Amino acid sequence: MRLVILDNYDLASEWAAKYICNRIIKFKPGQDRYFSLGLPTGSTPLGCYKKLIEYHKSGNLSFKYVKTFNMDEYVGLPRNHPESYHSYMWNNFFKHIDIDPNNAHILDGNAADLQAECDAFEEKIKEAGGIDLFVGGIGPDGHIAFNEPGSSLVSRTRLKTLAMDTILANAKYFDGDLSKVPTMALTVGVGTVMDAREVMILITGAHKAFALYKAMEEGVNHMWTVSAFQQHPRTIFVCDEDATLELRVKTVKYFKGLMHVHNKLVDPLYSMKEGN
């Protein structure tokens, strides 16, 4: 497991975006070889998406041969609702890049048969050859996607009832009105993400510090679902200084001492431009 510690949110976002960019370019995607990328929503990845859009607009990165799979979607919220994750992804990322809409996979929370929708999503991932890099974020309680505390660590894509802490946290997106906040969602399972060849989790802010401590310094525990990634062969946690506040000093010092190695993963930044 790698822990990459940057000074602040902006630098953490940039590091993550550079890593995604380099992974896609090194993969050399093409018409018969698509790169499969798992993606999160929420406030944490916005900075990363902004940088990826910059790399695309500068001609350094193309998503023409990339397939994306989003982590989750609310149940019962229309796709065109401003707070649906479909709207989030198109407004904040997809409409600014050259991805084929048919290759941007987002769960349908209004499907007539929700279980069939979940099963079909898992099948699409298999048909794509699995996910090369799954990018995620976590909540203050350590949940990844909508795998709330107590979720099975081998779970697959399914329908989940949201924890009250999650509903309260999401109320800010619905004018503070709890009655408007969806109480159920479709989500990839912990096992779905664990199947990815590589996982990168973005963790920023002091309010995520205890979750990072649980993920890094304590054992695997289904009450802290992010801890499952201790058992993944290729996990990277990308965080800012604030997120490390609950870690032991020697833990932080150890991983900061490896930054010269970690930075080689993003420097130089590769480009798809001719001659680069």
Swiss-Prot record:
<comment type="subunit">
    <text>Homohexamer.</text>
</comment>
<protein>
    <recommendedName>
        <fullName>Glucosamine-6-phosphate deaminase 2</fullName>
        <ecNumber>3.5.99.6</ecNumber>
    </recommendedName>
</protein>
<keyword id="KW-0597">Phosphoprotein</keyword>
<dbReference type="GO" id="GO:0006048">
    <property type="term" value="P:UDP-N-acetylglucosamine biosynthetic process"/>
</dbReference>
<keyword id="KW-0119">Carbohydrate metabolism</keyword>
<feature type="active site" description="For ring-opening step">
    <location>
        <position position="141"/>
    </location>
</feature>
<keyword id="KW-0378">Hydrolase</keyword>
<comment type="pathway">
    <text>Nucleotide-sugar biosynthesis; UDP-N-acetyl-alpha-D-glucosamine biosynthesis; alpha-D-glucosamine 6-phosphate from D-fructose 6-phosphate: step 1/1.</text>
</comment>
<keyword id="KW-0963">Cytoplasm</keyword>
<keyword id="KW-0413">Isomerase</keyword>
<dbReference type="GO" id="GO:0004342">
    <property type="term" value="F:glucosamine-6-phosphate deaminase activity"/>
</dbReference>
<dbReference type="GO" id="GO:0006044">
    <property type="term" value="P:N-acetylglucosamine metabolic process"/>
</dbReference>
<dbReference type="GO" id="GO:0005737">
    <property type="term" value="C:cytoplasm"/>
</dbReference>
<keyword id="KW-0175">Coiled coil</keyword>
<dbReference type="GO" id="GO:0016853">
    <property type="term" value="F:isomerase activity"/>
</dbReference>
<dbReference type="InterPro" id="IPR004547">
    <property type="entry name" value="Glucosamine6P_isomerase"/>
</dbReference>
<feature type="active site" description="For ring-opening step">
    <location>
        <position position="148"/>
    </location>
</feature>
<dbReference type="GO" id="GO:0005975">
    <property type="term" value="P:carbohydrate metabolic process"/>
</dbReference>
<feature type="active site" description="Proton acceptor; for enolization step">
    <location>
        <position position="72"/>
    </location>
</feature>
<feature type="coiled-coil region">
    <location>
        <begin position="103"/>
        <end position="131"/>
    </location>
</feature>
<comment type="similarity">
    <text>Belongs to the glucosamine/galactosamine-6-phosphate isomerase family.</text>
</comment>
<comment type="function">
    <text>Catalyzes the reversible conversion of alpha-D-glucosamine 6-phosphate (GlcN-6P) into beta-D-fructose 6-phosphate (Fru-6P) and ammonium ion, a regulatory reaction step in de novo uridine diphosphate-N-acetyl-alpha-D-glucosamine (UDP-GlcNAc) biosynthesis via hexosamine pathway. Deamination is coupled to aldo-keto isomerization mediating the metabolic flux from UDP-GlcNAc toward Fru-6P. At high ammonium level can drive amination and isomerization of Fru-6P toward hexosamines and UDP-GlcNAc synthesis.</text>
</comment>
<feature type="active site" description="Proton acceptor; for ring-opening step">
    <location>
        <position position="143"/>
    </location>
</feature>
<dbReference type="InterPro" id="IPR006148">
    <property type="entry name" value="Glc/Gal-6P_isomerase"/>
</dbReference>
<feature type="modified residue" description="Phosphothreonine">
    <location>
        <position position="161"/>
    </location>
</feature>
<dbReference type="Pfam" id="PF01182">
    <property type="entry name" value="Glucosamine_iso"/>
</dbReference>
<dbReference type="InterPro" id="IPR037171">
    <property type="entry name" value="NagB/RpiA_transferase-like"/>
</dbReference>
<dbReference type="InterPro" id="IPR018321">
    <property type="entry name" value="Glucosamine6P_isomerase_CS"/>
</dbReference>
